[in-house]
Amino acid sequence: MTFKYSVAGLPFEGEFKVTESKFDINFRDPVQSVFSVKFDLMKSNAGFPLATTAMKQVLDAYRFPEVTFESKSVEFNDEKFSVLGFLKIRNVSKPVNLIVTVLEDYNSESEKIYFSIRARFKRRQFGADGYYPLVRDAIIIQDVLTLNKSRE
């Protein structure tokens, strides 16, 4: 999953390695939908080796190798899911809102659903304040993902 950040005003991109994700869509009552995702920081990168090393240090990846997001509430309006949940980084949990936009028509029979995901948070809220203000506080998660229908 792609994330964006800024160093000295210049934009950079990295990738969080998703190890587990779940998006159970309740087609009859979308507010009953559930979203969760888990990232492995040790397999993630910040775009180039020096930044990746710094990211792992700042996020204390050796002690806390996983980042998780668990939804607490989901609203659906105008083909968008607004997913309020808790993001856990460095063993610190803070509320974050994800916007999940459906990119094409779907229904309960769809085998795949394509959607974009976007979230913004401030890393210093999680105690990840290394290299600030050179590396800005805002982290933006933005990507296009494919949801495959579960065979359960």
Give residue ranges: language-model regions.
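Low-complexity, acidic/polar, glycine-enriched regions of mature
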Residues: 1-152
